[in-house]
Every structure is written in C-alpha cells, then in structure tokens.
Amino acid sequence: MLRRFAVIGNPIVHSLSPVIHQMFAQQTQIELIYEKILGDDVKFEQQISDFFIQYGNGLNVTLPYKKRAYELAKVRTQRCTLAGAANTLWMEENQLHADNTDGIGLIRDLSRFLELKDKKILILGAGGAARGIIFPLLEAKPLQLIVANRTLEKAKELQRQFPQINVTSFAELTEFFDLIINATSASLSHQVIVLPEEVLSHKPFCYDLAYNQKTSTAFVQYARNRGCEAVDGLGMLVEQAAEAFFIWNNIMPSTKEILEQLRSF
C-alpha cells in the first residue's frame, strides 16, 4: 500500500527531503510518495490537521514551524520536549505524536569524524538550533560544553534549562576547543562569526549546522582558511531524515551511500 509523507515549511522549494526519502524508499523497497507543502503562517495548524485527515502517514516540519508543531502535538518524546521543537509528526491512536530527530542526526554525522567523549565542545548561538542539539551532545559525555552567544542573557536562558553547560559571549571567548559547532543563522545569509585567533589556534574540528549542496558554507570556508577541518550539515540532514524514516516505517535505511550521492549531484 502506498504510504504518504511530506515536509512542511516556508520557504520549501529547495528542500532535499523528498529526494532523500525517495532514496530511502528505493533502498528499503517501500512504496511511498513524499511531497513538499508550503506552510501558511495563518493556517499552519489546519494544514497539519488536513494532512493527517487525508491519510498522511508522517510529516516532517522545517523552519519556521518547529515550535508550533511541538505545541500542537499531544504526545512528545523526551528529546522533543527538551528541544522545545518538533520536526517529525505522526498519528497514533488518534493522537498527534512528535519527535525531534535533529540532535541524533547531528551525533551520528559527527561520529564519522571524531569521538565526542571527553572533548571540549563550543556551540556558537543560543537559539532554537542550539537548544535542539544540547541534550544529545551532553549524552555523549563531553569534557565541557560551552554555548557562546552575542548576548549573554540568551545563553543564560539555555543554561537554566541545561545546568551542565557553561555560557559566554563571543567577545569573551579565549580558550581552545576540540569541536566548534555553528548553530547561528549567519551562514544562511553568507555571513561569518569571526572568532578570536586563539580559539582556532589548536585547529578544532568545525561543523556548520547549515549546508550548501553546491559550495561550502561561509563558516566552513572560514574555518578551512584557518587550517581547520570543517564540514557542513548535509550529513546531519540525511541522518535526521533516516531517523524519521525509521520512526514511520520501522526500517533504518543506510545513509553513507545516499550522502555520497547528494554530495556528487
């Protein structure tokens, strides 16, 4: 029986999710359709309701609706609750369920490059993207997790929820790290958070949650120009999609060759 999935967001035209899920479908021999839905700021909740009334099996949610999807759900996973945002929805026993697969997607992609245990990790930015990855990063048992933001107060809000982290402002960054994660939106507008030279002097591994299929993001290029190994978030996108696919279909697809295909497009 043909299963129906979609991703909703605004903008949505450039989403790679339909391509990724069709690749998963071919690999696992599941018949499905996966559509793009342009989110309507006024009618978003009605759009969610209509999708499932019309026999939708699962829905991915992207910017700017993850918080509204979270609030709409009746049942949430622990990681979804801690993230305060949802990117994966489905119906079960007539109740809307929600999960957030971004964090596990990041961890799985990062594991290709380095071990997180006992590492010093810096997250740039204290918005929703940062909040969504803190819990899974803490589960990996780093030596230290620091969140840096332009305004310290916003970082302190995260610290109140996650007391295990330390916070600072960009201006006060002085120490070195093993891993730096850009969770700001700067790359989306081709801008860079300029870091003090001493922060990059030990050549930390640098990871940008944003991705650009054709070229490097601004942050990745900035880090590479300073001698650091750096990658963008395309692998995270594929891994979070695989986790959503597993939630909906109870089959975990293989991601390595799909990521390689996307990189070669």
Curated annotation (Swiss-Prot):
Gene3D superfamilies (alphabetical): Leucine Dehydrogenase, chain A, domain 1, NAD(P)-binding Rossmann-like Domain
Keywords of the record: Amino-acid biosynthesis, Aromatic amino acid biosynthesis, NADP, Oxidoreductase
GO-annotated cellular components: cytosol
Pathway: Metabolic intermediate biosynthesis; chorismate biosynthesis; chorismate from D-erythrose 4-phosphate and phosphoenolpyruvate: step 4/7
Pfam (any one): Shikimate_DH
EC number: 1.1.1.25
Enzyme class: oxidoreductase
Residues forming the catalytic site: 66
Entry's Gene Ontology BP terms: amino acid biosynthetic process; aromatic amino acid family biosynthetic process; chorismate biosynthetic process; shikimate metabolic process
Binding, NADP(+): 125-129, 149-154, 209, 233
NCBIfam families tied to this protein: aroE, PRK00258.1-2
HAMAP family assigned: Shikimate_DH_AroE (MF_00222)
Name of this protein: Shikimate dehydrogenase (NADP(+))
Organism: Legionella pneumophila (strain Lens)
